[in-house]
Amino acid sequence: FVGDKYQSIYQFRGGVNAMDVIPHQSFPLSCSFRYGQEIADLATKILQKADPKIKITGLGYDTKIVKGSEYNDDCPMLFISHSNVTLLDTLIEAYHAQVPTVLMSGKAGLYLDKLNSMIEFKEHGTPTYKPHQKYKDYKRLVFSERDSESTTFAKMIDENIDNAKELRQALSWSLSVVPEKAELTLVTAHMSKGLEYDTVMLSDDFFAAIASFKNGKPLDEPELNLPKSAKSLFLQVGDG
């Protein structure tokens, strides 16, 4: 019987975590052939927040961990953030720098449709995204559409519409990038599980999530998974 009590499937309504229900003697897996000891040590530090007994051994490629500010290579990179907000901010920066960038989720087109519609609704009262056309006004849309991207876009539009328009341009530009030729691929931690990339950068927005343990706030289980970097893991941290 093999199981993983941290799998998201157990969070579905009515889902039962078999690892907590069935009496068993547990033998946790403690070795990984996907990365070396440096990443294994980092994984251990993070996972011990959930279970102090965890100890990971890296038996794979001798992976290196360095500060993001020291990155000077030009190989394709996977950028992983804790939140969608950081991901979209990074897309805008990449657009300004003209670094070919794509969203791993494949949702750039959907995001563009929603964002453009919300901007047009706010400024001209003419939503362009069909599901938005049922609302009488922009405020009603914002009140009713509570998915994460709509909430993010509404906040951006209301706080700084010029920034929202920059994101609109960045999303449109990203759609023209061929994924195989992208130098930067953006993904959230939740969607990165199972991916393998030679070069990975972790955003600095993970530190707030990990620090939340000190205040007794649980970190979402899916975020406890580290990327399967084969060669290099870059941490986006400040010098302090």
Model-predicted regions and their roles:
Residues 1-67, 74, 78-96, 104-113, ...:
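Conserved helicase motor core of SF1/SF2 NTP-dependent helicases
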Residues 120-240:
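Conserved helicase C-terminal RecA-like lobe
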Residues 99:
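Short phosphate-binding/catalytic loops that engage adenosine nucleotides
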Residues 113-116, 121:
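Accessory recognition modules or surfaces
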